[in-house]
Amino acid sequence: EMDVLDDLFEQEYQKKTQQYRDSITLTNVTDRYIVEAEKYIIDGKAEKAIEMLNELLSRNPEQRQQAFIHYTFSEAYKDRGETDKQISELAQTALLDLKSATKEYASLQKLAYLLYDKGDVDRAYKYLNCSMDDAVFCNARLRFIEVAKFFPIIDKTYKLKEERSKFI
């Protein structure tokens, strides 16, 4: 029953995010362009989004905006199936989040998933643990739900790996 409620909560959150993205009036030009780049990605125009994001980065935006730009780059590269570039952009975002002491984020957990898929269980485990701790710290329910869905898989794999290494 909890999974059904969590899924409904997540679906409702995504629906509202889309509604706000469509109707938001942004006073900051950089923020407006980031939202436009997101729309291009959703519309299957990742290349156009990448061009726009490169232009934004060339303007030396503030650190928090840089994090959003790199995260949006990661979404564009995901759309294009360029996993290595997606990982690189998520790592950039995670570093910027760390520098700004941001605790409510998606980048580190997405990075953990991708690293796990590539077989880097140790880093995936560390990053997901950090994501879980930060989600609890700032009471970010959606982030906690997202991490909690995947954590048991990485945790089990990590513990099996640790167990095997004791016997070698």
Where are the predicted features?
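Selective recognition of signaling/oligomerization transmembrane alpha-helices
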Residues: S165-I168
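A "functional boundary" signal
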Residues: E1-E163
